Amino acid sequence: MSTLPSGSVSWYKIFQRGQNYMKAWPAEKSLAPMFPEHRVVRATRFGVRFMPAVAVFTLTWQIALGGQLGPAVATAIFACSLPMQGLWWLGKRSITPLPPSLLTCFHEVRQKLNEAGQSLAPVEGVPTYQMLVEVLKRAFKLLDKAFLDDL
């Protein structure tokens, strides 16, 4: 993830790209050994769903018991930051160019989709993980699940 495309992307856009990447990621267990995204997406979805409740519970518990508010606020902020960290990582990952090993897989899957009669838009620029996810999602929808065995 050290080689990002030139041009700065605002932090808000990175979070948006992270959400789009998370929504586009195919929920196929066969991808879990190859990509860390499967685990990150599941953890981020869990965090988005439950961490705000954990933060509210922590604050309420400390206020109700007359405890110190400082540690409770720190815990609540930490709990709310966990899903944001996942979205940030996914956003950065989505704009990262593919390494050479995945680049060949990307082109092979595109070729299989073309052979299956699917029209694909030409690749503009260097392929990124977002482009790979879109191709994989389409391949899982239209091709036989065994297409991963050939890669």
UniProtKB/Swiss-Prot annotation:
It comes from the Bacteria. Its main location: membrane. Signal peptide: none annotated. It holds the Pfam family DUF412. The chain crosses the membrane at residues 46-64, 70-90. It is a multi-pass membrane protein. Keywords: Cell inner membrane, Cell membrane, Membrane, Transmembrane, Transmembrane helix. It is found in: Cell inner membrane. One of its GO terms (cellular component) is plasma membrane. The keyword Transit peptide does not apply. Belongs to the UPF0208 family. This is UPF0208 membrane protein SG1605.
